[in-house]
């Protein structure tokens, strides 16, 4: 009977996917400027930017306000697709980890489901989209006609032509490690905070207020950046580099990049851009979960609260 009850009360994966896609659109529009600043700081090897505020003001002063939304199209598209896949695949993985007797998912199952969803999104969506986004964001100046890449599609075509299709998957290894770890921690923590703070259990028909979802999402999104900082820096460096005139590249892979950055710039450089990540990821999770929880909450209220047992 317990299993039958749980199956009646379960939110289907497609609804999780829809909720994630809507949350991704809102998050992208709100937080793109922070992502641009983070990328510029991580690519700054000569100290051109003195910090977040200086970087942002310099970008606006030298390139215009619109420059803070450079790469928005691939960023918004990538976030929407990423959250659709993340939320949907995580729900499917959790179904596989459900206890056959109680129908519940353990913290271990939740952690592994999140890691699997993070790995899947990293390989299928995040890596190629972030390669294009970072290449666009690193272009500096006020004259677009002088840019190497004219837009997302032109950028992708140029990378494929000059570096082969594999160029779109530059930095795949650190991206997999970053996203897998981030989502494992995030999904586990979000569920724990919902229960601890609001006594909210999935399938109970209770809809969290947006501010409650934002608090849980914000707290759940804080741990990842500290754990995955080096992977994010290495990912950005690998994605930003292109082959020189002789066909060579600066970083040969994830391990070589970590060693090179540590040797040339010091240990702290592996956490460069941490503050803007903390300014972007926890608020991003707060925004995304505020939207996603409303969508799934309405579904619970309409279809699950009075579902027959």
UniProtKB/Swiss-Prot annotation:
Solcar repeats: 11-96, 108-196, 208-298
UniProt KW Nuclease keyword: no
Superkingdom of this protein's organism: Eukaryota
Matches recorded under Gene3D superfamilies: Mitochondrial carrier domain (1.50.40.10)
Subcellular location: Mitochondrion inner membrane
Repeat among keywords: yes
Membrane topology summary: Multi-pass membrane protein
Keywords assigned: Membrane, Mitochondrion, Mitochondrion inner membrane, Repeat, Transmembrane, Transmembrane helix, Transport
Transmembrane regions listed in the UniProt entry: 17-37, 65-85, 111-131, 171-191, 214-234, 273-293
Tissue-wise expression: Expressed in root tips, cotyledons, hypocotyls, leaves, trichomes, stems, flowers, carpels, anthers, pollen and abscission zone of siliques.
Molecular function as annotated in GO: succinate transmembrane transporter activity
Listed InterPro entries: Mitochondrial_sb/sol_carrier, Mt_carrier_dom_sf, TXTP-like
Alphabetical GO biological process terms: alpha-ketoglutarate transport; citrate transport; malate transport; succinate transport
Primary localisation category: mitochondrion
Family: Belongs to the mitochondrial carrier (TC 2.A.29) family.
Name by which UniProt lists this protein: Mitochondrial succinate-fumarate transporter 1
């Amino acid at each position: 009977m317990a299993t039958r009850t749980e199956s009646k009360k379960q939110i289907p994966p497609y609804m999780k996917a829809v909720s994630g896609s809507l949350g991704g659109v809102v998050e992208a529009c709100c937080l793109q400027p922070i992502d641009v600043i983070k990328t510029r700081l991580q690519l700054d090897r000569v100290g051109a930017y003195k910090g977040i505020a200086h970087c942002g003001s310099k970008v606006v002063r030298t390139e215009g306000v619109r420059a803070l939304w450079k790469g928005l199209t691939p960023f918004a598209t990538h976030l929407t697709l990423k959250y659709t896949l993340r939320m949907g695949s995580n729900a499917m993985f959790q179904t596989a980890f459900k206890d056959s007797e109680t129908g519940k998912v353990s913290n271990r199952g939740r952690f592994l489901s999140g890691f699997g969803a993070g790995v899947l999104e990293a390989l299928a969506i995040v890596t190629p989209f972030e390669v294009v986004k970072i290449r666009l964001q690193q272009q500096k100046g006020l004259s677009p006609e002088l840019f190497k890449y004219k837009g997302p599609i032109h950028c992708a075509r140029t990378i494929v032509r000059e570096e082969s299709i594999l160029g779109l998957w530059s930095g795949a290894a650190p991206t997999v490690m970053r996203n897998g770890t981030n989502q494992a921690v995030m999904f586990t923590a979000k569920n724990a905070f919902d229960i601890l703070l609001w006594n909210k259990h999935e399938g109970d028909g209770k809809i969290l207020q947006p501010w409650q979802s934002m608090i849980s999402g914000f707290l759940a999104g804080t741990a990842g950046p500290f754990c995955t900082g080096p992977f994010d820096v290495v990912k950005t460096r690998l994605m930003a580099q292109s082959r020189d005139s002789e066909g060579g590249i600066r970083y040969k892979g994830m391990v070589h990049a970590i060693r090179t950055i540590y040797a040339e710039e010091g240990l702290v450089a592996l956490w460069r851009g941490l503050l803007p990540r903390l300014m972007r990821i926890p608020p991003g999770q707060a925004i995304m979960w505020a939207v996603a929880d409303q969508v799934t909450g309405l579904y619970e209220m309409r279809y699950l609260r009075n579902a027959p047992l």
